[in-house]
């Protein structure tokens, strides 16, 4: 059996076309969604991610502002800049690119962003709303995964969903969204005793551990849907996910590639959250 490839680039393109229409409706009312992206330091991967986000904003008509600061910048300077953006009516969303330099607390910085402009969905207020089933902004990667599953017609009601990875950014919010969709959810972490056994139970397997090849084909139920959230570099420099694609694709019913799977959806949902923030501000 050869798994169907779940094309995140194609699904994200459809979402961007829909967002263009929503932006056009806002522009007709003299409103243009705006996103501020703050980058501290010179992490090469972060610079690539920021460029991709800015290009995506331009594609759908979102006004974006990128502010780059040296790694020597202090946390208080960053917090002051965030506070000033709260009062800017042209900015609907504020994104601080992670990771931050070691001398800065990501928690304090994220909590300094107004929940109304927290388009990453990381603020504790937005996490709490997600927990209660009434999200204001859904974290972009889990949101993108849900949209991918929806685009493939995957039924989650009653399905066994297993998540490998329990981070605040992906694993935990992913569990909340799957629960809301009616799935029975298991989260595996670094202390899970029988990862392979847990993974084999999954009708839908979502892998977000940050470790290349942590899941291979022997750990997958035949016909399962496999979503690979990981992004790593192989020893020869190639991008690869957390799933060993070659062996997994022989067993799974459908699988996301890396790159071209979840990544484009994460950016698309950032745009969606920014447009949503602009629409709310216009009410």
From Swiss-Prot:
Summarize subunit and interaction data from the UniProt record for this chain.
Homodimer.
Which HAMAP family does the protein's record reference?
THF_DHG_CYH
Q: Which family does it belong to?
A: Belongs to the tetrahydrofolate dehydrogenase/cyclohydrolase family.
Could you tell me the superkingdom of the organism this chain comes from? Bacteria
Sample GO molecular function, one term:
methylenetetrahydrofolate dehydrogenase (NADP+) activity
- Cited PROSITE patterns: THF_DHG_CYH_2
Looking up InterPro entries in the UniProt record yields: Aminoacid_DH-like_N_sf (IPR046346), NAD(P)-bd_dom_sf (IPR036291), THF_DH/CycHdrlase (IPR000672), THF_DH/CycHdrlase_cat_dom (IPR020630), THF_DH/CycHdrlase_CS (IPR020867), THF_DH/CycHdrlase_NAD-bd_dom (IPR020631)
Asked whether the keyword Transmembrane helix is assigned, the reply is no
Source species: Bordetella pertussis (strain Tohama I / ATCC BAA-589 / NCTC 13251)
| Residues at which NADP(+) binds | 165-167, 190, 231
- One GO-annotated biological process of the protein: tetrahydrofolate interconversion
Q: Name the catalysed reactions.
A: (6R)-5,10-methylene-5,6,7,8-tetrahydrofolate + NADP(+) = (6R)-5,10-methenyltetrahydrofolate + NADPH; (6R)-5,10-methenyltetrahydrofolate + H2O = (6R)-10-formyltetrahydrofolate + H(+)
What's the protein here called?
Answer: Bifunctional protein FolD 2
Q: What is its EC number?
A: 1.5.1.5, 3.5.4.9
Q: In which pathway does it act?
A: One-carbon metabolism; tetrahydrofolate interconversion
Q: Could you tell me the keywords of this UniProt record?
A: Amino-acid biosynthesis, Histidine biosynthesis, Hydrolase, Methionine biosynthesis, Multifunctional enzyme, NADP, One-carbon metabolism, Oxidoreductase, Purine biosynthesis
Keyword hit for Signal: no
The record, for CDD domains, names: NAD_bind_m-THF_DH_Cyclohyd
Q: Which Pfam families match?
A: THF_DHG_CYH, THF_DHG_CYH_C
Q: What does this protein do?
A: Catalyzes the oxidation of 5,10-methylenetetrahydrofolate to 5,10-methenyltetrahydrofolate and then the hydrolysis of 5,10-methenyltetrahydrofolate to 10-formyltetrahydrofolate.
Could you name the Gene Ontology cellular component terms for this entry? cytosol
